[in-house]
Amino acid sequence: MEINIIAVGKIKTGYIDEGIAEFLKRLQPYTKVNINEIADEKVPTNPSKAEQEIVKKKEGERILASLTERTYVIALDVKGKPMTSTGLAKSIKNLQIQGNSSITFIIGGALGLGKEVLNKADFRLSMSHMTFTHQMARLIILEQVYRAFKIIHGEPYHL
């Protein structure tokens, strides 16, 4: 199983970078993880709905261009389906059983994901009813993927 993360924007905070590096290291025995950073668009101050849609469309085009053909796409979306850590582990295990060798998590930019990306997703996952920065979302999803693999392997999870 290969885990891909497509994320809009760069990590600009050292402690988040350190956390990401730690979970990438912890995931090595379980799965290969690829992170693809997509350039973010500059968001105007107080953007109109039309300007917001333009930003999401441009970022979405870059996201869609970087998707591989044979991957199960999970879009992180505040309006998506919430899932427990155990539920995520079961979903990953079921995808493996069904023959999926690749899962791609997509993390949008400051304005979220455009409809083209959401429509391409096989599943929309909500990590919380709260909104996180794309930087925090990247760290949190890596932690949850690590936790899922520990659950799948019947191993205790302790930080």
Give residue ranges: language-model regions.
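Short glycine-rich anion-binding loops that position phosphate/pyrophosphate groups of nucleotides
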Residues: I11, V78-K81, G109-L111
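Structured adenosyl-cofactor binding patch, chiefly the S-adenosyl-L-methionine
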Residues: K115-L159
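Short, acidic/small-residue loops that bind anionic groups at enzyme active sites
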Residues: I97-I106, S128-H134
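Conserved RecA-like P-loop NTPase ATPase core
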Residues: I5, I74, G108, I141
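General small-molecule cofactor/ligand-binding pocket signal
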Residues: I6, N34-N36
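N-terminal beta1-alpha1 ligand-phosphate binding loop
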Residues: M1-L27
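Short, well-ordered alpha-helix to beta-strand connector turns
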Residues: T31, R70-T71, A121
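S-adenosyl-L-methionine/SAH cofactor-binding core of RNA-modifying enzymes
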Residues: A39-S101
